[in-house]
Amino acid sequence: MQLYAINTDKSDARAVAEYLVNPASAASGVIYYNGTTEDHYLYSYDTQSGTVQTLFEYNMWYPTLSGSSIYYLDTENNYQLCRYDLTDGSNTVLTTDRVDLFNIAGSYVYYQKNDPSSPALMRMGIDGSNPEIVAEGNYSDINVTSSYVYFHSFGADTPVYQTSTYGPISVMTFDAAKAAALQAID
């Protein structure tokens, strides 16, 4: 999708970027995204000043802001999960696992480890510490709340599973999701 800006009174519509933009993360009036045409660098668009800035000249995918850091998939190194600190410019590899997708919940990163022999939904600290298996297999749609993490098997909408976001891992089915899906069929 191209990025456009418009005033709240619907005046002054203008193109901000004449290229595809994946607006992966936004905070405090700044949209963070990776390039999609000539490179996959980290960019920001300041909605107040209208300026686009190159923040990190490194190829990445799905930049996600948490605190003062951008978490991203490293497209040059088998999609390992990394963290780029916007304050000091440091870059840290959090896991060398190939990662399909991830989500951040406070002090944890939940991610799908892509491994032909042992795929798993994983959880680790935001600094890459203490990786642990949440559930063996391939999962998608990792959604986090203040209480629970929800996910389901890749390619299947049900059942939806849940586990505590911050407490001990204890995966169970989220039965309310199943009931809603069955009701939608009727």
Q: What residues fall within each predicted segment?
A:
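Generic beta-strand structural signal
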Residues: 8, 25-26, 36-37, 45-47, ...
